[in-house]
Amino acid sequence: MLDVVWLIPALPLAGFLILLFGGRRLGEPAAGWLATLCCAGSFAASVVVYAGLLGESEEGRHFTQTLFEWVPVGALQVDVGFLADPLSITMALFVTGVSTLIHLYSIAYMHGDGDFPKFFVYMNLFVFSMLMLVLGSNLLVTFLGWEGVGACSYWLVSFWFSSEANATAGKKAFVTNRIGDWGFMLAMFLAFAAVGTLNYDELFAGVENIAPVTATALGALLLLGAVGKSAQIPLYIWLPDAMAGPTPVSALIHAATMVTAGVFLMTRVNPILAAGYEWVPDMIAWIGVITALVAATIAVAQNDIKKVLAYSTVSQLGYMFLAVGVGAYVAAIFHMIAHAFFKALLFLGSGSVIHGLHEEQDMRRMGALRRFMPLTAVTFMVGWLAIAGVPPFAGFWSKDDILLFAWGSGGADAKVLWAIGLVTALLTGYYMSRQVFMVFFGDARWAGTAAPSSAGHGGEPADEITPGAAGDAGEAAVAADPGTAAAAHGPAGEHAEPHESPWLMTLPLVMLAVLSIAGGVINLPFNDDVDFLEHFLEPVLGENEAHIAVPTGTKVTLAVIAVVAGLIGIAVASAVYLRRRVRAVEPEVLAHAWYYDEEVSAFMGGPGRKSFDGIAWFDAHIVDGAVNGVATVVRAVGGRLRSVQSGFVRSYALGVTVGVVVVLGYFLTRLSF
């Protein structure tokens, strides 16, 4: 059963190739159905391999399949192969499962788009690349998938490239990720220099024999790659702008799969982190918890329905980094899976709202949609309760695990990490409740040309909102382009009554809602008081997993405190945006994301540009000048010598004569003295 692991990435690759060369001929909706079936087949193959692993003993849950030798260069021997172990197959299951639902949703969402087949070409290629990333048996194959998802992200974010904002957002995502990719590449060079291999099995066995400072440097470089891909401080600025792509792209790439690649990488290389100094895990924890808090504060003041979810994603990824930093690797994977369920649900739900409102994304022009889109509203609220950490939804169990490990990690800063995580949980309950109340409750603000500046500003009118002004780089920006799905849905701000989405869009919402409710069971104890997911991942993560000693009473107390924090956030949002008893406070500094993006842009356009110009001048005049100078000298000397080779016998005879005279003169002079 394990031998079919190659089929998991092969099916999306086959779908990509078929659609690349025959997508136009297949047309709509056949191209979408083919892409969806390829993902579904990949999910089925993942289930088969998963069942095969369950049938093995814990020691036997490790299978490497080599397809061919890729790089046979001296000591560097790299194969294209797949590693089927509990971690990789867990990732493959939720990547292919969620991807299948998003592909199904996209068939209806992208209906009428002039580039319908091309969209699914990119989507299948992305799924293939993501599976290469998680299944690769060595760092180089993982890096191949790593770069593949980055390229697909660029193509999909800027899919509606007729809008300059979309094209710019795609470039921003691509360039920002290059910084992290630089760290990943340096890590591969260092790993080969220190251990002599890039294969995971040999690398993890050999890392115990290298100096701690080398292991620390290796972990720090890999962390740089993870920070870029998973949108952590300071490289998070690309993710909110990436909402410019079609909403299914936001759900697939920027919520459920690609952005979790950094967390997966840090979890995969846990032996390297364990072999180095403790300051690298500490740094991971602090990067995560600060990112979680900062992104949550930004989310409370956003009005674009997708921007709220974007900053929420950055915040939840911060929780996962916190888990990795305190050694709670299972909790990180658990929250990654739960987050994939409820965040994909929330993004697809927002897409359903945007579709039903004819491409409107500004929450100030929504309201009362639960009466017109009941199924979307109910499923969206399931995702809301899950991310807010309300039991028994999936987010409660996974977030509680992370906060528990932060509390019991034993470090001097353990309680501080826990406290910041708790405040973030409160803010999460607040901003997600704000979104739900603004979109689905209150007065219908979509029917007029003016709306309250926020749903809870005491009902005071605000400046008129231009139809379609919702997303500064979203679907509304291209609604007028006849070649886009936005045009098929209708122009933003159109005063038609909102409508529920078709069944191809609502069916994935229902299935993801069920997973968001029941997803927590995957890490509940079933036998011998051992959590299922923890037991399954034991062969990969057990050796370096943190073990904490927290009394049962303390665990219950911490869980109750976390739930109460989320409920306080919900209650405050209710008072402000639902019952309107309190005037909303949305500082401009938060609406502008602490002006961090502006400062980065100003630096890149000012001092940064001058620095880069200086580097370019140094490269052109000093580095290239030295190389070109040597060539110029050699060329000049050669030109002078070339004149000696005249081709005339008399010239050669003269040269010989002069040479003989010089030699004789030299010896005569020596003999005279």
What is the role of each PLM region?
Residues 74-83, 503, 514, 525-561, ...:
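Aromatic-capped, Gly/Pro-kinked transmembrane alpha-helices
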Residues 100-145, 151-494:
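Hydrophobic transmembrane alpha-helices and their helix-loop junctions in integral membrane proteins
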Residues 28-42, 171-181, 371-380, 499-514, ...:
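Alpha-helical transmembrane segments and their helix-start/interface "positive-inside/aromatic belt" motifs
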Residues 59-77, 199-207, 398-405, 409, ...:
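Membrane-interfacial helical/loop segments at transmembrane boundaries in membrane proteins
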Residues 1-4, 22-121, 193-212, 237, ...:
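Transmembrane helix-loop-helix hairpins at membrane boundaries of multipass inner-membrane proteins
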Residues 37-54, 180-189, 380-388, 508-528, ...:
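Hydrophobic alpha-helical membrane-insertion segments
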Residues 446, 455-467, 471-568:
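Hard-cation-handling environments
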Residues 75-95, 214-226, 417-425, 546-569:
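Hydrophobic alpha-helical transmembrane segments
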